[in-house]
From Swiss-Prot:
<dbReference type="Pfam" id="PF08331">
    <property type="entry name" value="QueG_DUF1730"/>
</dbReference>
<feature type="active site" description="Proton donor">
    <location>
        <position position="111"/>
    </location>
</feature>
<dbReference type="GO" id="GO:0051539">
    <property type="term" value="F:4 iron, 4 sulfur cluster binding"/>
</dbReference>
<feature type="binding site">
    <location>
        <position position="165"/>
    </location>
    <ligand>
        <name>[4Fe-4S] cluster 1</name>
    </ligand>
</feature>
<feature type="binding site">
    <location>
        <position position="226"/>
    </location>
    <ligand>
        <name>[4Fe-4S] cluster 1</name>
    </ligand>
</feature>
<dbReference type="Pfam" id="PF13484">
    <property type="entry name" value="Fer4_16"/>
</dbReference>
<dbReference type="GO" id="GO:0046872">
    <property type="term" value="F:metal ion binding"/>
</dbReference>
<feature type="binding site">
    <location>
        <position position="168"/>
    </location>
    <ligand>
        <name>[4Fe-4S] cluster 1</name>
    </ligand>
</feature>
<comment type="function">
    <text>Catalyzes the conversion of epoxyqueuosine (oQ) to queuosine (Q), which is a hypermodified base found in the wobble positions of tRNA(Asp), tRNA(Asn), tRNA(His) and tRNA(Tyr).</text>
</comment>
<dbReference type="InterPro" id="IPR004453">
    <property type="entry name" value="QueG"/>
</dbReference>
<feature type="binding site">
    <location>
        <position position="175"/>
    </location>
    <ligand>
        <name>[4Fe-4S] cluster 2</name>
    </ligand>
</feature>
<feature type="binding site">
    <location>
        <position position="191"/>
    </location>
    <ligand>
        <name>[4Fe-4S] cluster 2</name>
    </ligand>
</feature>
<comment type="subunit">
    <text>Monomer.</text>
</comment>
<comment type="similarity">
    <text>Belongs to the QueG family.</text>
</comment>
<dbReference type="GO" id="GO:0008616">
    <property type="term" value="P:queuosine biosynthetic process"/>
</dbReference>
<keyword id="KW-0819">tRNA processing</keyword>
<comment type="pathway">
    <text>tRNA modification; tRNA-queuosine biosynthesis.</text>
</comment>
C-alpha cells in the first residue's frame, strides 16, 4: 500500500501520455479509455486530496502443461474474480477510514472506474510502469491487482517509485505481434490480450490469429519473460487466486465448442465472464486452425 497526494497539477504528465496514446488510436475500440474523468481525478471526487493505492499479489506457482492441445489463460483469471476479492478488502479499509474520520469523503475502485491506476500506483511508491505497460514491483514483479481509495483526507505521501527496466528489452522482443511498439507504449490493436478479451468481432485479425500460440484468454508473454517476475515473483497467500479446475490447462477442443450452459457453470465467479461464449469459441477455433 502507498499514498499519493493529489496536487493542483495532478499527474499532468500521465494525462499527457494518455492523450497521446489515444490520439494514436492505440486504445482500439476501448472508447472508455478516452473518458475525460480519467485525466482529472477531481472529476471523480472534487474534494480529493489523497489517493491510497494498493496492490494485491496474485501469483501462484502453477505452470501450464505446454501441451498444444491445451489453451492458455492468463494468470489473472485462473481463480476467483479479482474485482470481487479486492473490492471486498477495499470496502473494509474504507469502512475503517469512515470510523476514524467522521467527515470522510471517498470513492474506491478496482478496475471499475475512470482512473489511471498504474500512474497513481507509481506515484504512491508501489512500483514503476515497465516497458510492457504493466506496473512492476521490486517485491512481487508485475503480478499485482491494483485498487485505489480516493479520499478528501490529507495524508503524507510516499516517495514515487523510480524506473528500473534499464536497458532490458525482453518484453519487446518476445511479443509475437510486436504490440509493444516502443518502450512503455502498447498498441492494443496488435495485442493478443486485447483481442482475446475485448474484441467482440466474429473473426480475429489474421495477424493475431496466426500468432496466438495457444492463448484464448489474455496473454502473459511480456510478463513471463520479465526478469523482475522471474526473480522476485512470490506465491500469493490469497487462496481465492488458486486456479479453478479447468482454468489452468483447458482443452482447446472443449472451448471451441463451449455452450452457454457450460460457460455459465465453469465461469460463475471468474473474471473470464467478460469473455462471452462466442468469443471463447472464436479464440479456441483460431488456435486449432
Amino acid at each position: 500500500m502507498g499514498i499519493a497526494p493529489v496536487s493542483e497539477t495532478e499527474n499532468d504528465e500521465a494525462a499527457q501520455r494518455l492523450q497521446s496514446w489515444i490520439a494514436l488510436g492505440y486504445n482500439a475500440d476501448m472508447a472508455w479509455m478516452a473518458n475525460p474523468k480519467r485525466q482529472n481525478i477531481r472529476e471523480l471526487l472534487p474534494s480529493a486530496r489523497s489517493v491510497i493505492a494498493v496492490g494485491l499479489n496474485y501469483y501462484t506457482p502453477h505452470q501450464r502443461s505446454g501441451d498444444p492441445a491445451h489453451g492458455k489463460i492468463s494468470r489473472y483469471a485462473w481463480g476467483r474474480d479479482y474485482h470481487r476479492v479486492l473490492t471486498k478488502k477495499l470496502k473494509a479499509l474504507n469502512l475503517w477510514l469512515e470510523q476514524q474520520v467522521p467527515d470522510l469523503q471517498s470513492r474506491y475502485y478496482v478496475d471499475t472506474g475512470p482512473i489511471q491506476e498504474k500512474a497513481w500506483a507509481e506515484r504512491a511508491g508501489l512500483g514503476w510502469v515497465g516497458k510492457n505497460g504493466n506496473l512492476i514491483s521490486r517485491d512481487y514483479g508485475s503480478w499485482l491487482f491494483l485498487g485505489e481509495i480516493v479520499t478528501n483526507i490529507t495524508l503524507q505521501g510516499d516517495r514515487p517509485h523510480s524506473q528500473h527496466c534499464g536497458t532490458c528489452t525482453r518484453c519487446l522482443e518476445a511479443c509475437p505481434t510486436q504490440a509493444i511498439v516502443e518502450p512503455f507504449v502498447v498498441d492494443s490493436n496488435k495485442c493478443i490480450a486485447y483481442h482475446t478479451i475485448e474484441n467482440r468481432a466474429e473473426i480475429l485479425p489474421t495477424a493475431i490469429a496466426d500468432n496466438l500460440q495457444g492463448w484464448v484468454a489474455g496473454c502473459d508473454i511480456c510478463q513471463d519473460v520479465c526478469p523482475w517476475n522471474q526473480r522476485f515473483a512470490q506465491p500469493t497467500d490469497v487462496a481465492d487466486f488458486d486456479p479453478y479446475e479447468g482454468n489452468l490447462n483447458p482443452e482447446l477442443e472443449t472451448l471451441a465448442n463451449i455452450t452457454e450452459a457450460d460457460w455459465q457453470q465453469q465461469f460463475t465467479a471468474s473474471a473470464l465472464r467478460r469473455i462471452k461464449p462466442a468469443m471463447l469459441r472464436r479464440n479456441a477455433q483460431a488456435n486449432l486452425q
